[in-house]
């Protein structure tokens, strides 16, 4: 046999030991095989004929040789031990949100054995990488909409927040810490727009760096504005000078503190700003073990507390998020596991 061949194992007749032996061969075998059961023409035991058995005549009169005869062969689903083991590994990877590992294992199985769930795992693997182009393409194939926030201008923020949550659940605390700053800046900016009516881009200039468009505060656009007066006054009180460079969460918090009267919102922003400043440099510039206790000791909050504050801040933005949206990865996992059970 070569890789293009499939072995057909007929378990319709023979002693019980012979049939069991063929089933064991299929279960333990590492080669492509199918277990075949052939029903009798009348659907029950054949009449036993031991004498005067004219093979040639019976073959000539065999109705199965007629065109259009019913196919009495039926494949018996009998997964190999290898398939069973690999699918259990796939399930374990999915339950810990390691979709690329699950996809790699799925690809080691024959394509016909994973047709029910392979595309869903691929969809999940691209989703966690924020590869929305391929996620959208795969949704067309799977017909499973995994993105609760559909707007292209808003979903990137929410999906990014979900990946932060996944890093926390997986105990990847260094990556969890490093991923906080981008979402904090984006959330603060969206909050400033929704709660205070201030659009940061109105006070910035665009520039290109390393082939990508960036932005920085524009001294010219800030001059003579209330926004400019607030940030300049804040730094002057500390004996410093506001430098109109990149936009940081600190700047956005200063503006929110001045223009918003919501004390709870300002406390949330204060907490996250302190978390960001107290621990991000530790993870970025030192070789150090970071645990949940490390985070608590340096910030006063466990990872789950930080994630809870990020979730709460979304409620101050213009992105409409239901509580169940935060469980969308678990819902996606249930869908994949369900499809694996429906093979």
Task: List PLM regions with ranges.
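Long, low-complexity, Lys/Arg-enriched
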Residues: 1-8, 15-343
